[in-house]
């Protein structure tokens, strides 16, 4: 079978307004769309998410944005990962867009991990996180990110939604390694695994040590 590529962040390249990490197809399309809108209509860009990783990605794209997390209840009608993230990204985006006055570009996103047909969101507690790590270690799983962009212009609203999927492979992990990871804490904050789909972040020390490789967009896994 075809092996997965190494999981280190992509090399940096020149792109428009400055040094930006090499982008996956979805992120590249997002950058082009947002830049064209800003150039033509000088709209403000609003990120409908409180995720620090998504804010970091926008900064990497060179796009200044206002962070305005959605407060909408997350209700989905599908059990398919790609449809779930598309539904939730659209829900978040439109929730914020409805409360936004003036011309704007609102971006909503949602990420889930899927393993053998089961959707893994953020861990509900340490036992849930432990179960996730034991399931994922030594195997390949999928990370789905859905993105919705709503463009509000002169009382008209245009909305586009898309999804990207990346395969991620973990090295085998011992029980001791899993427990060591679960014990990691951030000073004054929640445990490192608590706010991430699947209980891990590829851009963290965990990703460097335990992610064997990926097939697809690195930044899709980042969120």
Sequence positions of predicted segments:
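Anionic-ligand binding patches
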Residues: 43-46, 80-223
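Extreme N-terminal basic, low-complexity initiation segments
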Residues: 2-10
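Short linear segments in intrinsically disordered or otherwise low-structure-confidence regions
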Residues: 6, 21-22
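Short glycine-rich, Thr/Ser-proximal phosphate-binding strand/loop in the N-terminal lobe
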Residues: 62-79, 158-165
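Polybasic, lysine-rich low-complexity intrinsically disordered segments
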Residues: 36-37
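N-terminal beta1-alpha1 ligand-phosphate binding loop
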Residues: 43-63
């Amino acid at each position: 079978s075809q092996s997965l590529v190494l999981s280190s962040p992509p090399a940096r390249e020149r792109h428009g307004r400055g040094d930006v990490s090499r982008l996956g197809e979805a992120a590249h399309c997002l950058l082009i769309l947002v830049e064209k809108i800003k150039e033509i209509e000088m709209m403000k860009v609003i990120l409908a998410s409180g995720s620090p990783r998504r804010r970091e990605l926008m900064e990497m794209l060179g796009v200044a944005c206002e962070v305005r997390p959605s407060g909408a209840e997350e209700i989905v009608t599908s059990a398919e990962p790609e449809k779930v993230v598309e539904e939730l990204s659209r829900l978040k985006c439109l929730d914020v867009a409805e409360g936004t006055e003036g011309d704007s570009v609102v971006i909503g996103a949602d990420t889930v991990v899927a393993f053998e047909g089961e959707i893994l969101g953020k861990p509900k507690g340490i036992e849930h996180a432990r179960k996730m790590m034991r399931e994922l270690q030594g195997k390949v799983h999928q990370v789905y990110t859905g993105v919705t962009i709503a463009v509000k212009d002169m009382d008209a609203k245009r909305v586009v939604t898309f999804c990207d999927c990346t395969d991620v492979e973990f090295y085998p992990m011992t029980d001791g390694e899993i427990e060591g990871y679960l014990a990691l804490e951030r000073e004054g904050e929640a445990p490192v695994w608590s706010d991430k789909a699947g209980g891990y972040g590829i851009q963290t020390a965990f990703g460097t040590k335990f992610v064997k490789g990926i097939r697809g967009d690195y930044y899709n896994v980042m969120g």
